[in-house]
Amino acid sequence: MKYFFSVDLGTMQDFTAISVLERVPRKMPADKLPDDPSLGAPRYTAVYVMRHLERLPLGLDYPTIVEKIKGMLSHEKLARQSNLIIDATGAGLPILQMMQQAGLAPIGVNITGGGMVTARDAGYNVPKAELVSALNLVFQSRRIKIPVALRLKAEFLKELERFKVTMNNTGVNTYESAVASVHDDLVLSVAMGIWYAEKTEGHTYFAGNRNAKARTMDDPLEYL
């Protein structure tokens, strides 16, 4: 099991959103194993359990945000096996640097309107469409679990419902809330964590070697 601690940084008017995802293996049914023996025999698919959602109060300064995150990451489970993903777009870069100075190891995600993922210092440039696509994939393949008692669950689902795809003048899909008054901070926080987990860990675990990766496979099972 591994945790993905993801932070979508806000502004004076927008919340900073924190999400914690736990990646756990779920056994795959025999009829969903690959036919190609060269791929091995993946027996488990990755499922993401949303363990925590939080919005920080508006107006917090950067040092306070960094201390808050550092304190949360000192939790026993998170300290041992977590990845810290942070929105490094715009004003996010100074916070990323402050986290590094505080002894943390953040992975920066600079959200762009482009069409390709590219590497950058301490992270990636990632099109917003890529983030939303990764989130859509785990929902469509039923590989995400939202506990009934999860704090801010209703707000997250409201954001998700009102997120829409629009087409700009250059023909590139963009993703934004369909209602101007509805934030997208929770959705983007979760999407960044999912995207990074899927990129670095893959979709499936192999029997005997759970760190191995395999081709993308849909999982028709119901939510846990």
Describe each model-derived feature in a short phrase.
Residues 132:
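Glycine-rich, anion-gripping cofactor-binding loops and their flanking helix/strand elements
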Residues 1-110, 117-119, 129, 141-224:
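RNase H-like, metal-dependent nuclease domains and their acidic two-metal-ion catalytic environment used
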Residues 138:
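Carbohydrate-associated surface elements
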Residues 135:
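Mobile, glycine-rich extracellular loop/lid and propeptide segments
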